[in-house]
Amino acid sequence: MLRTRPRSPSADPAPCWSPQTPAPSPAKRRRLHQEPACPEPLAQPELEAPAEPTTSVVFLAAGSALQLPLDGVDLLLEPEPTSVLQVSLQGHTILLVPEGLQDSTHFGQPGFVAISPQGAAAQDGPQDHLVGLQEETFCEYFYQEDVCDEDADLEFLEHWASPPDDQANGNFSSIPGVPSPLSQDQVPGPSTGAEQYSPRFIWELDINMLGPFPGSPLQPLPPSPSRNPQEQLPPCPPCSPRAPRRARKRLVYE
């Protein structure tokens, strides 16, 4: 049997540690579920900012007036024949334009153009006034531009068609200062129709263009020898027969 030896008594017995109780933890605060505050109702756009004033243009014939019912009262508006009448009523601006100022063409003054074919109409828009340019101004402007362009093209063509006097006797190329290698009798004349694109014309042009420049060290290349149609090309060697291919096995899965 196994026996255990009793512990020997000592002067200083080992202290006996007793488990200490943990200190009470601070009480946790309860989180109260707070509902989000209700957002304030959005103010209506009409209350936030006043609406922009609206502008209307009315064209009146000579001797006519505009009648507007306002709070049970009929308001009669008649502009002078030589001026524009502007009236503001409850955030609405009305421009009364006489018929005489509708087609104003004075320099520095805008001309009012009516939209309706009758010549008198009203149009609502955010602009303070409506300005329109007549079609005659645009037509005249574009016509002058086209005439200037055509004159410039004619001058350019006349300059090339009639060379200066110092160049009329000699032959010059398109590059200024470089004489042309073509003599007067070699210069090809203008041709029309199929002659311009015929092979003979192209061949003569190539020969003339290959002429050497005077004083140039470069020499033209010799012409390529013409191939005789009677010459036969050497027969091609017979192709070697191909080796037979090996049979391939294919697996078919059902």
Swiss-Prot record:
Membrane-spanning ranges: none
Biased amino acid composition, Pro residues: 214-241
Residue segments, region Disordered: 1-50, 161-196, 212-254
Compositional bias ranges of the Basic residues kind: 243-254
One Pfam family cited in the UniProt record for this chain: DUF2476
InterPro entries in UniProt: PRR23
Domain of life the protein comes from: Eukaryota
Family (UniProt): Belongs to the PRR23 family.
This protein's name: Proline-rich protein 23A3
Origin species: Mus musculus
